Amino acid sequence: WNNLEAIYREKVARATDENELEEDISIAKEFPYSKMATLGWVPPTRKAEEKVWNLRGFFEVARLGLLEILRIPGIAYRKVGENSKSNYALAAWAQKARLDSRTILTSPVNIDKLSSVLSDIRALTLEDPESFCPKLRQLLGECGIAIVFLPHISGSFLHGATFIEGNHIVIGLTVR
């Protein structure tokens, strides 16, 4: 009897996994996967199941169905349009900003220091982007802010976003 119970439980688990995979395949179709693969965010593939596994890893979830709320809690963003696909593109872009921000070393958040370096930051805008970006990253990093520059994903209508990740503030900007 125990053997029959084990076989039954295994079949139920497989059926559940197959149903979840089918649900995740339909969700994966909404993401701009080919653009994400072109940018190197996920491995390129044409197989739906591989896309699901790659997106699960990218979003750090066991099932894509868990991404019902596509936004990072507390995210503030600037975008100039909206459609159903734009939310998925925004979620992918914001997740990449989150992942990249984890590799940036920052001091603890210090708003007073930020206030004191704002004039220096404004002065950097007069310089060439190649020279001011490293300086800007350093100044903001000393204030507990990680700045991430990411390419624009078509359909996201996104210019930038800010959110808190761990113990630092993240500013993500699109590069157009």
Over which residues does each language-model region extend?
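Short amphipathic recognition helices of helix-turn-helix/homeodomain-type DNA-binding modules
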Residues: 1-41
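Residues within well-ordered alpha helices
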Residues: 35, 55-58, 139
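Residues at alpha-helix termini
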Residues: 39, 59-62, 143
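Extended, domain-scale alpha-helical bundle/helix-rich regions
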Residues: 44, 50-69, 73-76
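Alpha-helix boundary/N-cap detector
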Residues: 46, 50, 109-112
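Conserved binding/catalytic microenvironments
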Residues: 72-176
